[in-house]
């Protein structure tokens, strides 16, 4: 099963189980959780079921394409269901069956691993899912998002698409993954991975990035004052990515790191609160629609 087929199979599987199949969000981010389809929709009482592919950038993870299992740019397949279905583990195992992985034929373990995103003020309890000794998925029951208690609790399922594809195709490097039957992952991304690593670790200008962070933070604050939820979130995400680039460049001390994370978390909290207030003013329309449908 090539990489495209893995995505198509998961899209069909979760669509058949009531999920909106959304698209990735068009700004740099370190995780699929940062997409407003998850970060914002996990807040408040309204039900929400969504699935989507999210390209992620984690500058510090880059290894110039030389590490077979580690890139600074990669893909997550994200599922969020609110409220969490009682049979969510069974649904997940069925999704593996749809990919041709029979759980009864493999060593599948749910290993306790609570998750946290300090910059988003988000955390939850959950597990890593290990398939024959390799982590392929993260399960998280959200307790907070934007430092706001999640009621009801959402379940987030994050598949590592590259790891899944490597397992299914029995290859030992990301670059060897068949994206289609005649194009590899390396054909598509290896050169870009090398160049982005050169930028992240060598060519980026720390002064420029520090200035960018300050400008993005200033813009986020004035947008929050104007009560513009999504534009505000855009600039919070830009702050986060600028910080990650500075971190990769090695120019932020331990003390500064904590302070920068706190500044981003404070902005994320304000955006989350603003979103909740906005939905409340609208009388939580999706909650009403669900009650009428029932």
UniProtKB/Swiss-Prot annotation:
Quote the gene name from the UniProt entry: glyQ
Q: Which reaction does it catalyse?
A: tRNA(Gly) + glycine + ATP = glycyl-tRNA(Gly) + AMP + diphosphate
MF-aspect GO terms:
ATP binding; glycine-tRNA ligase activity
This protein's name: Glycine--tRNA ligase alpha subunit
Q: Which family does it belong to?
A: Belongs to the class-II aminoacyl-tRNA synthetase family.
Biological process annotations from GO: glycyl-tRNA aminoacylation
Enzyme class comes to ligase
Please verify whether the record's keywords include Nucleotide-binding.
yes
């Amino acid at each position: 099963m090539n990489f495209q087929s893995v995505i198509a199979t998961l899209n069909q599987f979760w669509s058949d189980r009531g999920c909106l199949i959304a698209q990735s969000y068009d700004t740099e981010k370190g995780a699929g959780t940062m997409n407003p389809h998850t970060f914002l929709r996990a807040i408040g009482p309204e039900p929400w079921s969504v699935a989507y592919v999210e390209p992620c950038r984690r500058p510090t993870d880059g290894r110039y394409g030389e590490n077979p299992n580690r890139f600074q740019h990669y893909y997550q397949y994200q599922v969020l269901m609110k409220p969490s279905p009682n049979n969510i583990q069974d649904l997940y195992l069925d999704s593996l069956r749809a990919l041709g992985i029979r759980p009864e034929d493999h060593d599948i373990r749910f290993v306790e691993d609570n998750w946290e995103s300090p910059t988003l003020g988000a955390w939850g309890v959950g597990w890593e899912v290990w398939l024959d000794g390799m982590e392929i998925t993260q399960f998280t029951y959200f307790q907070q998002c934007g430092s706001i208690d999640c009621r009801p609790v959402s379940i987030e399922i994050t598949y590592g698409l590259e790891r899944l594809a490597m397992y299914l195709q029995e290859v030992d490097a990301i670059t060897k993954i068949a994206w289609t039957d005649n194009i590899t992952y390396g054909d598509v991304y290896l050169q870009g991975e090398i160049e982005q690593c050169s930028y992240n670790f060598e060519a980026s200008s720390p002064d420029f990035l520090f200035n960018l962070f300050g400008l993005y933070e200033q813009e986020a604050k004035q947008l929050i004052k104007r009560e513009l939820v999504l534009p505000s979130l855009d600039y919070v995400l830009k702050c986060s990515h600028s910080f990650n680039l500075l971190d990769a460049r090695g120019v932020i001390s331990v003390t500064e790191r904590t302070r920068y994370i706190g500044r981003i978390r404070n902005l994320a909290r304000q955006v989350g609160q603003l979103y909740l207030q906005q939905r409340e003013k609208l009388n939580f329309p999706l909650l009403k629609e669900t009650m009428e449908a029932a």
